[in-house]
Structures are given as structure tokens and as C-alpha cells.
A protein has these predicted regions:
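Glycine- and acidic/polar-rich repeat regions and solenoidal domains
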Residues: 1, 7-177
Length: 177
């Protein structure tokens, strides 16, 4: 779709044989998701690469998504122009990341990224292509069963976005590992 808005829905049980079944799978430009719940899917939200796409996700809960292979995540944003991720609770990613984004600009504000006591996430926030990223006022907690100890990963797959700048301001990091 193009310029899609989704509000106040629950997505659960989305699975396909190639292990990337998503509550929402967006290939076109423009996506706004508000006040939704995504749980027990292979991916909560999965988007393609679209250079003119702006994505806004706010007030949502993502939990227990992932196929357990480390390649599926609570939220996986492809190479888009901008992601705004605000006021969400992303927890219990099944070995994948609670948020993975390849966006050129990421504005990540006032979220909770949590493993709790029994979560097994990998990175809490993965920005594999770097870019301009603002992490402001978030709570990031790795539980004792987390797959690894990295809370925020930046440009680990190559700094290919045009601007490289990471701002981490007024966040709370908790490691229970």
C-alpha cells in the first residue's frame, strides 16, 4: 500500500513457511501505525526498502515476535527515509531484535525496550546501516537470558546511509545479565 494508516488493531499468529510472516508487511511508501498490539508473529512489522517512505509507529506494543532464528524481529524497518518510533513497548523478541531499522533517519523517543526476566532478545535496538539516529528518553533493559549483551548496535553492517550521527540522550540502560 501507499500512505497507509493502521490504528487500534491486534495482530497475532502471522506465519509463513519462509519464516518472515508479519503482522504488517509494507512495501510501498508511507506507513503510520498507532495504538496496535503485535504478538506471536514471525515479525511484528516488516517493511521493504523505499527511499521516499516515512514511517511513524506510536503507542504500540510488540511482544513475543520472532521465529527464533535471529533473523526475524519485533519490528524490522527496511531502508526508508525516516522512522519515528515513539511511546512504544517492545519486549520479549524471540532471539531477534526488539527494533531493527535501516532508515536514513531514526527518531526513537520515549519507548521501553525490555527483555524482562525471561526474554531472549539479541540487540535491543539495531541500526545496522548507521544514519542519523536520535535515541531520546528510552528505557532499555537486557534480561538475564538475553542472547547477547549489546543494547544498541550502530552501523555494524556498514555505514551506508549518507549521514552518520548517533545521539543518545537521557536514556536508561539496565543489564540483568
Amino acid at each position: 500500500g501507499r500512505n497507509t494508516t493502521v490504528e487500534r488493531l491486534e495482530f497475532t499468529g502471522c506465519r509463513v513457511p519462509d519464516r518472515n510472516g508479519a503482522g504488517i508487511r509494507q512495501e510501498g511508501p508511507g506507513l503510520t501505525v498507532r495504538d496496535c498490539v503485535f504478538h506471536h508473529n514471525q515479525d511484528g512489522i516488516l517493511t521493504g526498502a523505499h527511499p521516499e517512505s516515512d514511517i511513524v509507529i506510536e503507542g504500540c506494543e510488540f511482544g513475543h515476535n520472532g521465529a527464533g532464528d535471529g533473523l526475524s524481529h519485533n519490528v524490522y524497518i527496511g531502508r526508508v527515509r525516516r522512522l519515528t518510533f515513539r511511546g512504544n513497548w517492545s519486549h520479549h523478541a524471540g532471539i531477534g531484535h526488539t527494533l531493527k531499522s535501516r532508515a536514513e533517519t531514526n527518531v526513537i523517543i520515549a519507548n521501553r525496550f525490555m527483555d524482562e526476566a525471561d526474554g531472549t532478545s539479541s540487540y535491543l535496538v539495531d541500526l545496522p546501516n548507521g544514519g542519523r539516529a536520535f535515541l531520546l528518553g528510552n528505557i532499555l533493559q537486557h534480561g538475564p537470558r538475553a542472547e547477547n549483551g549489546t543494547a544498541v548496535s550502530y552501523a555494524q553492517e556498514g555505514a551506508v546511509n549518507p549521514v552518520q550521527a548517533l545521539y543518545v540522550v537521557n536514556n536508561t540502560f539496565i543489564s540483568d545479565r
